[in-house]
Amino acid sequence: MAAFPPVPDQRQVDAFWAAFQAATGHDGAPAAVYPFGDSVDLAEELLALILAGRKQATADLAMFYEVEGETVPKPGDHAIVLDGAGRPRCVIRTTDVDIVPYGDVTAEFAAAEGEGDLSLDYWRRAHWDYYTRWLEPRGLTMRQDYPIVCERFVLIWAAAAPPG
């Protein structure tokens, strides 16, 4: 089984970002470079939803950012989304960020995530399992009151084909 998340080839990331800048005139560096999900298959599935325009939001445990040494996204941030193999595939821009308890995530936000049947019920089941997979190795149990970083984004640029 391949390690996840994959370590991206920095030359590919740099070339991808340069192509994005040349195509869009954007100045500056990406705020983050990452795949979605916690497995190759999930990364590919979620990337496909982004590229299809169906997935326009994502949600992570707030504690993830602290534990992993990551910065909470903010409106205007640009991120490079990787595929399951660690290749850069698209650029998204954060449009809105709210931090709410897990139990307060709305049906409207769940639908914007673009996953499953778009229902809040599906979102809660899938994300409870996803968060549990991250928490359990750290000796923690998922709770309804854990803060969730609810990020909305737009797809602003995609590569015609994966690099390399």
Task: Tell me the role of every PLM-derived stretch.
Residues 1-91, 97-164:
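Mixed-charge, low-complexity intrinsically disordered regions
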